[in-house]
Regions:
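Long terminal segments
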Residues: 1-22, 57, 63-133
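Short "repeat-start/strand-capping" segments in structured domains, especially the N-termini
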Residues: 9-12, 28-33, 46-50, 63-67
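Amphipathic alpha-helical packing elements
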Residues: 51-52, 59
């Protein structure tokens, strides 16, 4: 069943793709934690909407199944559930998932920045640099 505030089905692993269609990371079936395919924890989903680093920095937000960058309002990643936004390339095959590594402790969230206006284009950070903000 799809949660009203979260566009993804419960208990499903959701792959996120970059602007070239390459699978970069996934949302674990717990619906909260994002992992790279090598098992590295990347960030978590806060209030079913915001992507937050474990250091407490707001990185982006979910919008119609895609992730929007807090830096400039551009589209960073998409899923099979994405709608709207810039044109999406064909999705490439997903790599196998390695065992998940332990997650770091979540630090207190920083103040949430104001959202920039959405831009209907791909972010230059549609890659792992998004998580190194």
């Amino acid at each position: 069943m799809i949660n009203v505030s979260n566009p993804f089905p419960d208990n499903e692993i959701i792959s996120f793709y970059d602007c070239t269609g390459m699978p970069i990371f996934y949302l674990h079936s717990d619906g909260e934690n994002f992992y790279h395919y090598d098992g590295t924890p990347l960030a978590y989903l806060y209030n079913n909407e915001f992507i937050v680093s474990y250091s407490g920095q707001y990185l982006g937000w979910l919008y119609n199944g895609s992730i929007i960058d807090y830096k400039n309002g551009t589209y960073v990643f998409f899923t099979v559930y994405s709608s709207g936004g810039p044109s999406r390339p064909s999705r490439k095959a997903r790599p196998s998932r390695a065992s998940r590594k332990s997650r770091p402790s979540k630090l207190s969230c920083n103040s949430r920045p104001s959202r920039p206006s959405r831009q209907i284009r791909w972010s230059e950070r549609s890659n792992m640099s998004f998580f190194r903000s």
